[in-house]
Regions:
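Short, conserved beta-strand element in jelly-roll/cupin
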Residues: 46-47, 51-55, 65-84, 120-124
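A short beta-to-alpha transition loop/helix N-cap that caps and shapes the active-site region
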Residues: 125-130, 140
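Conserved short histidine dyad/triad with adjacent acidic residue
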Residues: 31-36, 50-66, 101
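Ligand-binding loop in jelly-roll beta-barrel domains
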Residues: 81, 101-127
Length: 159
């Protein structure tokens, strides 16, 4: 059995160049031995678990959908809004929800405290993401290549 205590995991933070998108995460699966770049399913694990945190007033990522990946969310603390294809839905501690492939989504912390939640993804090989607001695609590769009609920066057209 492999075991970690999530209280001991380092939190990785990220921010877009202009600060519209800010977040942090504890990579639980990687701490348990997951190797994200491997194509060996024993090394990749069949799912990926992260504890994510979005500061008050921020968005974690641009509005996007996955080509193959399912994502399950469980809110631990805080409040927010999930933007999705049918509009937006408020979320709070205890809420759980799921997005299947091709369902665009985005989480925003509209509360006064951090929005903290678990994300569990099924981790498919060959995944890509579509960003409807900026009409671009992310093709999963070591280079995190974005496609429109030319190479682009990840946050191009988002801020």
């Amino acid at each position: 059995m492999q075991k970690v205590n999530t209280n001991d995991l380092a939190e990785l933070t990220w921010s877009s160049p202009k600060g519209k998108f800010v977040g942090a995460g504890k990579q639980v699966s990687e701490a348990l031995g997951r190797k994200p770049a491997s194509t060996d399913l024993n090394e990749r694990h069949p799912f990926d678990v992260e504890i994510s945190r979005i500061p008050a007033g921020k968005l974690a990522f641009p509005y996007h959908s996955h080509s193959a990946q399912w994502e399950f969310y469980h809110v631990i603390s805080g409040t927010g809004i999930v933007r999705h294809k049918d509009g937006s839905t408020p979320i709070e501690a205890g809420d759980a929800f799921i997005f299947k492939p091709d369902e665009p989504h985005q989480l925003e912390n509209n509360g006064a405290e951090d929005l903290v939640f678990y994300v569990v993804a099924d981790n498919p090989i060959g995944e890509s993401c579509h960003y409807p607001d900026s009409n671009k695609w992310l093709v999963r590769s070591p280079e995190r290549r974005l496609l429109r009609s030319e190479n682009l920066d990840y946050f191009d057209g988002e801020e």
